């Protein structure tokens, strides 16, 4: 299992969509170090294939991408619903033999 998270940059109205195998609060603290902007952990979503979900979220929001993993989201409150929606797609695909190899490589223990 892993965690996909949404962190808000309060000064720039941007959101980071990221993934961690560890504690998202520790990840926030690492990002905050040396960063003059105030960052806040908004949402976390635990799932079996966090790297796949993160990639799908980045693709979903590519039109509002600011820089790397930072996005200008209009409605960040939809993040958990979007995670659940995309995660259900991942769940349905993981049993498909054409996709199962990729999923086994990316799976976290």
Description of each model-found segment:
Residues 1-109:
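Non-catalytic accessory segments flanking enzymatic or RNA/DNA-binding domains
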